[in-house]
């Protein structure tokens, strides 16, 4: 072609176009491109320097001057179409793309398309051809006009990127439709071609993209060709097959991804014009491709349903190049360009698109755009570009999670593609690692895993490796015929695990409870491991909670104590989820186990530790007789079920143990495991007893106690019921709520925790304030209703109790049960003993006033089966509060005496921060039985001192690091508030009966002298038989006087062990501290004391009445002395001392005090000079000797010299005392230790008979 190649270049987007023109008519030079800016639209479109511009947007440029051209260019705002003439040296290789692609499903459809119409007009006067360009949409069928003579050339472009079998480069797809429109009636034919043009070739326009040579005729036009333009497939230029016909050698063979070929061959058509032909070989498979090419090439042309076959055209050579800009802009710009082309063309295209609606146009445009974008992503020019990699990653993820097969991540290939791959492709074994994570590495590995690869699926969560072989068609998993993929495997595994766990749980439920303590430990470990797998189990367990609880109850009864838990060890393991008072454990089990008489109670008791019984302070307390009987008989029948209602199922460990068990990470994520630990426990507590874990025996609950637990009003009712209500209320608020319990409590009577001076007055004025001693609630809860239930029916022990019984049953004990319950809470025989001691006879009911205070105090001290951190903290804090709420008189009276937590030890030694830690048993003074009873609310003098110390308490706590975790305990230990009278009055051996005695004393208290004299009171004191050293009996008496003014008759177990228990209880009557102290002290006491009943003492802890100091009768003289000789409170002393010592608070203030201290010390040395046995006996009697001047309550205590009762009472009095007692027990014989004890005792300036030379700490525990 002598004139060169004509190229149509389209640019869109508006100026600047990026090229400069030169020449023009005035210069008599053709208009040429002088310069092209790099990376500009002109450069991208393939415009080259030196190209001659024939027309601009259809306006011929031959007659235009340069200014006119510039003006014309400036008028173009959107799209620029240039027809340029480029010299060429010959024919160029042809690139053509077939529009029909049977595998078009794999390729994105639609995309921006730009259509340009090139009209080639033959003019007689010119050898060249004029080209008119206009935008046209190619979506409309164009083959309708294929029969038109002399058509026009229409060039359509669209951006598409496809995955070429052997190509990494992106290709610009152009639909180039060449149509020649007739002019002046000249005949002609229309040739339509769809071309795929690579961007590289576009830029190198010197090498023409498409070369059409010769006449071609469409024999079989496809009327729907326009609708199939989306099927365009990208092609790669390849050399003509060697096996192709020789006629192909003169042309170029182009193979598309679908296996089609476009060949441009030199041939002769029938007219002999010597024009080339264009052939398209369709649907050539790998095997038949050569044959078909050969055959079709031999024929010279092939009927193409897409291309329309062969047609003739006037001889011409036209090369088309389309800019990339045009392809990017898409149809948006050509949709409105119809006005730019000749009217005849618009009319024609309007006719073609008449059937299209606007929505259809939009849909097609969107498709074309999407196709163009998708092609760019799937066959990007730079496959390593960030955008392409991201797209692939997202695509893999989408495939992985959009399949129906639970997310295997394997994309099922199309049948056609599989057929192709199955052809000549060798099978390749690839390993793709499919994990559960979403990491990029996993996704990369997952990318495009073919069906013929082996997929190794690692389920890292389950730790199992599942190998899934996927060959050509992808083998389905045998194990899961219906579903496939990682998800299916995960669910199958989960099913198996859940079945295993269910079977294990069933086995454990049926026979697991019979194991020993070691088994329990193992159970704990297993439970920890499988805590996250409890989902299904919890529901089932809830339904079976009652059953399991009964089973546990039986097992508890039968199982020997372990870890200090009697019979509970078996169930304790499963139940350990519920925090328990570890310190109290030994008391619970060992004491119960040791005391033969308590064995019946043991079975009940052991369940009690595990399942906190409802507040022992039930509305109805069993008769003291029953308690005494149960306690007195060492070999009692099997423990009766606790009278209180059984704890809610949540309190039972089994309930929690059978928790759901979730197997894998995915499962855990989908179904969060049940919360465990403190949070779970708190949730269980819910609204009922949030701070306490009440482990109830599986025995049928006592209807009365059950009503107390279930009825909030009943709990808040007068007497013990009040204890339960406030307890729950404040527990729900938290441990600190106990500080406000007294004020917030809605009890009709003041809570035992904070006996008011008025209460004290009432006690002194009304001998019959049979309200359970404030301490009794604490004691009773410690005991647990089990004892009350077991013992109440037995009136025989009333004799023992009778001594304790208060002669003034002014009013039936509103909740005497509180006292009984106090004894009941003790899990062991001691607990039973305590209950007996504290249980007032029905005949001598305690006044509601006492019961109410007891109830108030009970929450902290009286919680029956209270265990766990929450219960401990609450009890400790409440006791601390009570200590500070003591009547001012009582506090003062008791502050007068040395405030040593362990009377046996000197205050300095006891309070030394260093010393505190060493005594394992009495590490916490508050927990020790020696803990000053005066510290409890009952002491009026203690109240003042406690208030003072309360203000300063936090400082001393800071100073004393040892107790930093339990500052409140430390506070209690610092205050050995015990009126001298109560000290003297309480014999060491006084038994738990002291609780009864205290009420009796309080009844007589109004006339304190009379109380002392009253035989009943004396008898009660005997029952108390608190060790002489224990001033606490006095405190109990005092404390009892206001609240327990009407002493609750307490049956004291006659068994020596019971005595010991009661004694310990009596010794450590700290109603406020009973819960915490009893727990801690109990352990200590248990160690020091071999009594099995110690476990119970922790529950009994300090009976409120015991804890309360003797009232004014014993403390008045002390009060006066104390006022006269005011010494710093233990808190003040600790605050002043750099070491936190409180010696200053206990040192003699004057000569009188010094003399008294010396005398007391000497007396003690004499008393304790003998062996422990002698010493024990002396202790039991010494208080009597000293009690001559002591208060009636003290005298009563002394009156009960029975070593057994004394022992039990001392034991039960205050389990917390036991630790100290035990500790001192070793040093009791030691003069030095005794001197220390005396030091704490004598430091109190108690010249009066109220002074108790034998502190609790001195009491000897057998």
UniProtKB/Swiss-Prot annotation:
Q: What is its main location?
A: nucleus
Per the UniProt record, one Pfam family is PDZ
Q: Where is this region: Actin binding?
A: 745-898
Q: Where do the record's region annotations for Interaction with ACTN2 lie? A: 477-658, 659-922, 899-1153
Q: Which InterPro entries match?
A: PDZ, PDZ_sf, Synaptopodin_domain
Positions of region (F-actin bundling activity): 659-914
Which residue stretches does the UniProt record annotate as biased composition, category Pro residues?
A: 609-625, 639-650
Region annotated Interaction with VPS18 sits at 1-174
CDD domains on file: PDZ_SYNPO2-like
Instruction: Recite the UniProt keywords alphabetically.
Output: Cell junction, Cytoplasm, Cytoskeleton, Nucleus, Phosphoprotein
Q: Which domain of life is it from?
A: Eukaryota
- A biological process term (GO) from this entry: autophagosome assembly
Which residues fall in a compositionally biased region of kind Basic residues?
342-352
Where in the numbering of this chain does the PDZ domain appear? 6-88
**Compartments where located:** Nucleus; Cytoplasm; Cytoplasm, Cytoskeleton; Cytoplasm, Myofibril, Sarcomere, Z line
Q: Which residues carry this modification: Phosphotyrosine?
A: 617
| Motif placement: Nuclear localization signal | 392-400
Chain spans, region Interaction with ZYX? 999-1018
Regions of compositional bias (Polar residues) in chain numbering: 89-105, 246-260, 558-569, 592-606, 786-799
Q: Motif location (PPPY motif)? A: 614-617
Annotated region (Interaction with FLNC), positions in chain: 808-1153
Stated family = Belongs to the synaptopodin family.
By what name is this protein known? Answer: Synaptopodin-2
């Amino acid at each position: 072609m002598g004139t060169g190649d004509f190229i149509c270049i389209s640019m869109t987007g508006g100026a600047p176009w990026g090229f400069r023109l030169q020449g023009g008519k005035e210069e008599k030079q053709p208009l040429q491109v002088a310069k092209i800016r790099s990376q500009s639209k002109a450069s991208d479109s393939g415009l080259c320097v030196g190209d001659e511009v024939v027309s601009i947007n259809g306006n011929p440029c031959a007659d235009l001057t340069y200014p006119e051209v510039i003006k014309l260019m400036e008028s173009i705002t959107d799209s620029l179409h240039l027809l340029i003439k480029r010299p060429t040296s010959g024919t160029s290789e042809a690139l053509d793309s077939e529009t029909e692609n049977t595998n078009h499903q794999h390729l994105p459809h639609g995309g921006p398309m730009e259509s340009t119409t090139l009209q080639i007009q033959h003019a007689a006067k010119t050898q060249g051809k004029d080209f008119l360009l206009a935008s046209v949409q190619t979506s409309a069928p164009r083959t309708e006009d294929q029969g038109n003579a002399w058509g026009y050339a229409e060039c359509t472009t669209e951006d598409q990127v496809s995955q070429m079998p052997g190509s990494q480069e992106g290709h610009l797809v152009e639909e180039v439709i060449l149509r020649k429109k007739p002019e002046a009636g000249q005949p002609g034919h229309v040739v339509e071609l769809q071309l795929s043009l690579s961007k590289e070739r576009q830029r190198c326009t010197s090498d023409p993209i498409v070369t059409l040579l010769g006449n071609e005729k469409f024999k079989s036009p496809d009327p729907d060709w326009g609708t199939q333009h989306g099927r365009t497939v990208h092609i790669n230029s390849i050399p003509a097959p060697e096996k192709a016909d020789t006629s192909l050698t003169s042309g170029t063979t182009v193979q598309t991804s679908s296996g089609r070929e476009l060949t441009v061959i030199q041939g002769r058509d029938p007219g002999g014009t010597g024009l080339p032909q264009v052939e398209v070989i369709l649907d050539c498979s790998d095997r038949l491709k050569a044959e078909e090419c050969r055959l079709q090439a031999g024929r010279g042309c092939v009927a193409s349903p897409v291309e329309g076959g062969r047609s003739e055209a006037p001889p011409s050579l036209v090369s088309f190049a389309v800019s990339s800009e045009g392809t990017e802009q898409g149809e948006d710009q050509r949709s409105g360009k119809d006005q730019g082309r000749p009217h005849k063309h618009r009319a024609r295209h309007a006719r073609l698109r008449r059937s299209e609606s606007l929505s259809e146009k939009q849909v097609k445009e969107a498709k074309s755009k999407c196709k163009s974008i998708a092609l760019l992503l799937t066959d990007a020019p730079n496959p390593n570009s960030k955008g392409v990699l991201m797209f692939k990653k997202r695509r893999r993820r989408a495939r992985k999670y959009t399949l129906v097969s639970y997310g295997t991540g394997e994309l099922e290939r199309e049948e056609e593609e599989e057929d192709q791959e199955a052809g000549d492709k060798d099978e390749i074994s690839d390993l793709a690692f499919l994990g559960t994570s979403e990491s990029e590495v996993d996704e990369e590995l997952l990318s495009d895993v073919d069906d013929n690869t082996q997929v190794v699926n690692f389920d890292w969560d389950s730790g199992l490796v599942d190998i899934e072989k996927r060959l050509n068609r992808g083998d389905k998993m045998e194990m899961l015929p219906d579903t496939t993929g990682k998800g299916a495997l995960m669910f199958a595994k989960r099913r198996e695990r859940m079945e295993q766990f269910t079977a294990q749980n069933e086995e454990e439920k049926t026979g697991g409870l019979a194991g020993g303590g070691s088994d329990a430990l193992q159970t704990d470990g297993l439970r920890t491991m499988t805590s996250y797998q409890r989902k299904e189990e919890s529901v089932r367990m809830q339904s079976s909670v009652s059953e399991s609880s009964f089973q546990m109850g039986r097992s508890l009864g039968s199982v020997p104590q372990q870890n200090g838990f009697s019979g509970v060890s078996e169930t304790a393991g499963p139940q350990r989820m519920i925090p328990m008072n570890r310190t109290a454990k030994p008391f619970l089990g060992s004491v119960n186990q040791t005391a033969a008489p308590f064995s019946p109670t043991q079975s009940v008791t052991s369940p009690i530790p595990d399942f906190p019984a409802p507040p022992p302070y039930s509305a109805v307390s069993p008769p003291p007789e029953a308690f005494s009987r149960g306690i007195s008989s060492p070999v009692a029948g099997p423990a009766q079920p606790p009278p209180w209602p059984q704890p809610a199922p949540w309190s039972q460990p089994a309930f929690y143990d059978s928790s759901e068990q979730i197997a894998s990470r995915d499962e855990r994520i989908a179904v969060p495991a049940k919360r465990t630990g403190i949070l779970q426990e708190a949730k269980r507590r819910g609204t009922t007893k949030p701070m306490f874990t009440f482990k109830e025996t599986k025995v049928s609950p006592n209807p009365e106690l059950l009503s107390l637990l279930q009825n909030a009003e009943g709990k808040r009712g007068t007497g013990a019921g009040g204890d339960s209500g406030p307890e729950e209320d404040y527990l729900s608020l938290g441990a600190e709520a106990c500080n406000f319990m007294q004020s917030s409590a809605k009890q009709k009577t003041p809570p035992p925790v904070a006996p008011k001076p008025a209460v004290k007055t009432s006690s002194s004025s009304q001998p019959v304030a049979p309200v359970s001693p404030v301490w009794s609630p604490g004691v009773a809860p410690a005991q647990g209703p089990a004892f009350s239930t077991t013992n109440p029916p037995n009136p025989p022990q009333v004799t023992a109790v009778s001594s304790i019984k208060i002669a003034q049953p002014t009013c039936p004990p509103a909740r005497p049960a509180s006292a009984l319950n106090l004894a009941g809470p003790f899990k062991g025989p001691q607990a039973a003993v305590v209950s007996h001691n504290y249980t007032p006879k029905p005949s001598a009911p305690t006044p509601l006033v006492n019961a109410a205070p007891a109830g108030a105090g009970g929450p902290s001290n009286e919680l029956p089966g209270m265990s766990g951190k929450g219960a401990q903290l609450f009890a400790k804090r409440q006791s601390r509060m009570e200590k500070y709420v003591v009547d001012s008189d009582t506090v003062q009276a008791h502050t007068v005496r040395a405030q040593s937590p362990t009377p046996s030890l000197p205050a300095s030694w006891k309070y030394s921060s260093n010393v505190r830690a060493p005594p394992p048993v009495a590490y916490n003074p508050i927990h020790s039985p020696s803990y000053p009873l005066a510290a409890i609310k009952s002491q009026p003098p203690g109240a003042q001192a406690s208030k003072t110390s309360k203000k300063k308490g936090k400082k001393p706590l800071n100073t004393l690091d040892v107790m930093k975790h339990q500052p409140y305990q430390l506070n209690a230990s610092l205050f050995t508030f015990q009126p001298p009278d109560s000290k003297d009055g309480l014999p060491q051996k006084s038994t738990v009966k002291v609780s009864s005695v205290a009420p009796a004393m309080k009844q007589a208290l109004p006339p304190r002298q009379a109380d002392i004299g009253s035989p009943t009171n004396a008898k009660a004191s005997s029952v108390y038989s608190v060790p002489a050293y224990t001033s606490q009996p006095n405190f109990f008496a005092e404390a009892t006087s206001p609240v327990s003014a009407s002493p609750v008759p307490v049956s004291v177990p006659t068994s020596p062990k019971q005595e010991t228990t009661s004694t310990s209880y009596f010794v450590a009557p700290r109603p406020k501290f009973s819960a915490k102290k009893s727990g801690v002290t109990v352990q200590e006491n248990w160690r020091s004391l071999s009594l099995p009943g110690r476990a119970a003492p922790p529950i009994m802890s300090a009976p409120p009445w015991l804890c309360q100091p003797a009232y004014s009768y014993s403390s008045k003289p002390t009060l006066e002395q104390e006022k006269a000789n005011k010494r710093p409170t233990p808190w003040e002393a600790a605050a002043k001392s750099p070491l936190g010592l409180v010696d200053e608070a206990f040192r003699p203030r004057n000569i009188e005090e010094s003399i008294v201290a010396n005398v007391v010390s000497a007396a003690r040395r004499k008393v304790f000079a003998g062996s422990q046995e002698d010493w024990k006996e002396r202790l039991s009697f010494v208080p009597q000797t000293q009690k001559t001047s002591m208060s009636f309550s003290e005298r009563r205590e002394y009156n009960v010299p029975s070593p057994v009762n004394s022992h039990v009472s001392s034991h039960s009095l205050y389990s917390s005392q036991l630790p100290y007692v035990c500790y001192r027990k070793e040093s009791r014989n030691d003069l030095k230790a005794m001197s220390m004890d005396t030091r704490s005792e004598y430091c109190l300036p108690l010249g009066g008979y109220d002074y108790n030379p034998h502190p609790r700490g001195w009491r000897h525990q057998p």
